[in-house]
Structures are given as structure tokens and as C-alpha cells.
A protein has these predicted regions:
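The structured alpha-helical core of multi-pass membrane proteins
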Residues: 1-277
Length: 277
């Protein structure tokens, strides 16, 4: 709550100096950017602004659908205000040499900068915990569906959905260490992360389409959903493809390893059960 309040306040403070940034809400500018020569490829550069949307409901078992939906309205508002504030800050410093200063930290008053960095570090730790908890939930579901090898699951409290899988925790630890050793700098991780996010979004859309089909939703609604989201997500995917050789291949390699493990485990159990019967 403190982190997102800070984002909103910083953004609003800068936005008050240049309200013209709000014209970015006009969809025409998005269309103009995409159709103009070279503008389309900028989608790959700005895509990390959507970070978090691909895992919005990964903590469904921990937080509940209603809590996530209500909090998302607040989170999105503060994020938009902060991005507008960064835009206003960049316009105010147009033509200047920034010397490595990022708009996010540039918006902060000098006296507040240490507090802002500390709060950003704490927010990163909290966000990492959300990813770890979401991984436990997904692996637990995969085990129940016989898509993942059996693993020891601990329930540290009586609260619904609270669980801990030691083997997954160690896998995440090893993965983080290896990724950091390979990329060395956070800026070099953008390629792998961006490609991961869009592939996750495409998979979520595919699964939701499958769900709508088996639940016999109205066909025009299904097609409307598929066309709308495919246009948006495929556009971002195409714009991200140039990042494949700059680290994006690592995301695909990890995805292939996990998918292969799930495939082998599932069909091996089917073969074994067939002989047992």
C-alpha cells in the first residue's frame, strides 16, 4: 500500500507541472505509433510496462478473486499516474543529458531519494515473495492433476491456500543464481523477461478460450475475445522477437524443460496405469 501510494503521489506531483501528458489517453496516438514506420518495433521496448499483468491471478488461492480485483483498481490508477508523471518529467528535461538518471528516481526530491530506493528494494522483495507463493500454488495444482512428479508439500499455517514446497523453492533459488550469473546486469534481463511475459499472456488467453468453449459460451463472444486479444498479443510478440538472441532464448529453454517434464510424467503415468489395470 505504501509503495503504490508513493508511486501515485510522485506521479501526480510531476503531472501537475504539465497536464498535456494526459492527451496520451487518446487511442489515436497508440494507432499512430503502430502504423508509422518504425513505431511498431517500439512496442517491444515499452512492453515491460505491463509487468505483473501476466501473473495477476497467480495468487488466487492465497488472496481470493475479490481481493485481487478490488486492489487492482487502486494499483492500476497509481501506476498510470506514475507513468504520466515520468512522461511529464521527460518533457521538462527534453534535450538535456540525463547522465544515467532514470525518470523514476529523477522525479524524487533529493532528500527523499534514500527513502525511495529503500522502499523500492522492499517492494522488490515483496513482489518476489508473490512470485514464489504463486509458483507453489501452480506446482501444487500440477501435482494434483498428475502433471508434475510428487513432491513434499508443507502447510505452515491453518489459513486456506498457505503452502510451501521445499523442492520448488530450491529450484527457484538455483534458477535465480544461474540467471544472475549469466546476465550480470538487470538491463540485460529485459529480453528474457519481456518474451516470458508475452508468452504467458498468450497461454492464458488460450486457456481462457478453451474454458469458454467447454462452458458453451456464446460463439460471437468467444470469437470477439480471441480476435481482440490475438491482435494485441501477437503484435507484442512480433515486436519482441528481435530479443530472442539477446537472452529471450533462455525463457524458451526453461519453458521447454518444464513442458517436457510435465509431458513425460503425465504420459508415463498413463502407460503405467494401463499395465496395472
Amino acid at each position: 500500500l505504501i509503495w503504490f501510494l508513493m508511486l501515485g503521489i510522485l506521479g501526480t506531483a510531476q503531472l501537475s507541472n504539465n497536464w498535456s501528458v494526459l492527451t496520451a489517453l487518446n487511442p489515436y496516438y497508440a494507432y499512430d505509433l503502430i502504423v508509422n514506420r518504425g513505431g511498431f518495433w517500439l512496442l517491444g521496448a515499452v512492453f515491460l510496462c505491463t509487468t505483473g499483468a501476466e501473473a495477476l491471478y497467480s495468487d488466487l488461492g492465497h488472496c481470493g478473486r475479490t481481493n485481487i480485483r478490488i486492489s487492482w483498481a487502486f494499483v492500476k490508477t497509481t501506476l498510470i499516474l506514475n507513468y504520466f508523471g515520468q512522461g511529464a518529467w521527460l518533457l521538462a528535461h527534453e534535450g538535456e543529458k540525463l547522465n544515467g538518471i532514470t525518470p523514476f528516481y529523477g522525479m524524487m526530491p533529493t532528500w527523499f531519494l534514500p527513502f525511495g530506493i529503500a522502499l523500492a528494494t522492499i517492494a522488490t522483495i515483496v513482489a518476489s515473495q508473490a512470485l514464489i507463493s504463486g509458483s507453489f500454488t501452480l506446482i501444487n495444482e500440477a501435482i494434483r492433476l498428475n502433471f508434475w512428479p510428487k513432491a513434499k508439500i508443507k502447510y505452515p499455517s491453518d489459513l486456506k491456500g498457505q503452502l510451501y514446497i521445499p523442492s520448488v523453492n530450491w529450484l527457484l533459488c538455483a534458477g535465480c543464481i544461474l540467471v544472475v550469473l549469466y546476465f550480470k546486469e538487470s538491463t540485460r534481463m529485459e529480453a528474457a523477461y519481456g518474451l516470458t511475459i508475452i508468452l504467458g499472456m498468450l497461454m492464458s488467453s488460450r486457456l481462457l478460450t478453451f474454458f469458454m468453449k467447454i462452458k458453451h459460451y456464446w460463439q460471437p463472444l468467444i470469437w470477439g475475445f480471441v480476435i481482440t486479444y490475438l491482435v494485441v498479443e501477437l503484435s507484442f510478440l512480433i515486436a519482441q522477437m528481435d530479443k530472442f538472441l539477446r537472452g529471450g532464448w533462455i525463457s524458451l529453454m526453461i519453458a521447454v524443460l518444464l513442458s517436457t517434464t510435465m509431458f513425460i510424467w503425465y504420459y508415463a503415468r498413463k502407460i503405467r496405469n494401463r499395465y496395472l489395470e
